[in-house]
Amino acid sequence: MEVQRNFFIFAFLFVSFLLWQAWQSQMFLNKKTNEKIDPIFHFIDVKKNKKKIFIKNDVISLVVNMYGGDVEEASLLAYKDTLYSSRPFKLLETGSDFIYQAQSGLIGKDGPDSSINDSRPLYSANKNFFVLGPNEKELRVPIKWLSKNGVIYKKTFILKPNRYDVQIEYDVYNPSKESLNMNIFGQIKQTINLPKKRNVYSGNFALQTFRGAAYSSDDNKYEKYKFDMIANNKNLHIMTESGWIAMLQQYFAVAWIPDNLGKNTIYTSSLDHDTAVIGYKSPIINIPPNSRSIIKSKLWIGPEIQKEMKLVAPNLDLTVDYGWLWFLSQPLFKLLTILYSIIGNWGFSIILITFIMRGLTYPLTKAQYISMAKMRALQPKIQEIKEKFSKDKQRISQEMILLYKKEKINPLGGFLPIFIQMPIFLSLYYMLIGSVELRHAPFLLWIHDLSSQDPYYVLPVIMGLTMFFIQKISSTNHISDPLQKKIMNFMPVIFTAFFLWFPSGLVLYYIISNLVTIIQQKFILSNLEKNR
């Protein structure tokens, strides 16, 4: 039956799309131009120092190095490191084989973090551990440094309950008789090559989730920038009044959001082609003699939760990257979250959304089966035309077109549902691997994570059996070409192998979709038989 041919076409189109997607992504990201980087943007390092403080609210735990006051480690307390781990997920860390840090400071002519100084400021604090209490609305963690000329620098970390954004506030008191000129900077640095322990699942085949740098500016709401570009010194140098800079990975992001002090500079840099840096630098900030100035910026360290990121900075929620099918993935995700709020199980929500999608496309499915039934009825006439004009292929085409017009049949009518189902399928895939809400989301029995593959491959096998059943009730006896018939008979095996490494939530969607296909096929074809 033509439906088997359609399955094969679907597979071909899907694989072709994966290859095109990988090529398109590479071409798009390589369009950046090499920029000359000012020496002030060069890598700012921190001395190895055992003096650290620990800051914690109910969702994040931070480790701050007192040299410069950089965030060297950050753990997300609401997210496990792995599915069966009791440890919280560590987003930022400083180790022997991997570095991922959020740095900030004051640079420029009079900035204590300027590269012209021998070292960065060594701050002090009145204690080592700071924890937000159960009934507290805000945790303020001040660290201080006194310069040789008497300037007092106070850097304060401000955390609020159940929030992943951290306010960084510099309070600079200038008691001297001269003005001070400096710039605030914020940058994120990360080792480009992941160690084995962090190199975990991030997608399948060509549809990998993005890991790299990103930024938002006056001209671009959201732009990704590959680590490879930074490693090869093809760096950014962008002036903008709005925006942010970030480093992204599957489900999580670290971002600096500067205060609007005028034209900020967004830049990238690298160290020995092994460490990538993206950052921003503010315009010059003047602090008059005998005066105080407050300078602020904001740091996001956490999961890519769209509704929360929207509140922190414009366009920060765009880091939840659903690819070019975002216009389908976004409403699908919103619908899925509504269903989850009612049902309380992501797996059953996926099942219900499958019924909704198949219900919406039912008119097209019905038209597909009617078109295929008419095509089957025309097979004797088509065969007669082929035999009659076997030596004239052009005449065969002309006669078949006339036959289709006479019988009022569109030979491509059976393909429309496939072109509808393919983007739905892909958008659901992007949603599953890009939405942190589905990370480690359980279903039933052995399925403990709908965003990763079935550990025992049970769902892919069930999916293959549903395809085999569809093939049996459809029958391939009408296919005259022996090679094509063998391909059709082998399709369930091909698809089963194809789906082994797909997220179990996606395989669940396809199983339910196949079951709906079986029901709809039996119903529509039985009605067609009755109406003959």
Curated annotation (Swiss-Prot):
GO molecular function, one term: membrane insertase activity
Location within or outside the cell: Cell membrane
Assigned keywords, A-Z: Cell membrane, Chaperone, Membrane, Protein transport, Transmembrane, Transmembrane helix, Transport
Residue ranges of the TM segments: 7-27, 336-356, 413-433, 450-470, 492-512
Assembly and interaction partners: Interacts with the Sec translocase complex via SecD. Specifically interacts with transmembrane segments of nascent integral membrane proteins during membrane integration.
Keyword Nucleotide-binding: no
Protein name per the record: Membrane protein insertase YidC
GO annotation terms (biological process): protein insertion into membrane; protein transport
Lineage, top ranks: Bacteria, Pseudomonadati, Pseudomonadota, Gammaproteobacteria, Enterobacterales
InterPro entries given in the database record: Membr_insert_YidC, Membr_insert_YidC_N, YidC/ALB3/OXA1/COX18, YidC/Oxa/ALB_C, YidC_ALB_C, YidC_periplasmic_sf
Membrane topology, from the record: Multi-pass membrane protein
GO cellular component terms listed in the entry, alphabetical order: plasma membrane
Protein function: Required for the insertion and/or proper folding and/or complex formation of integral membrane proteins into the membrane. Involved in integration of membrane proteins that insert both dependently and independently of the Sec translocase complex, as well as at least some lipoproteins. Aids folding of multispanning membrane proteins.
Family: Belongs to the OXA1/ALB3/YidC family. Type 1 subfamily.
Pfam families registered for this protein in UniProt: 60KD_IMP (PF02096), YidC_periplas (PF14849)
Source species of the chain: Buchnera aphidicola subsp. Acyrthosiphon pisum (strain Tuc7)
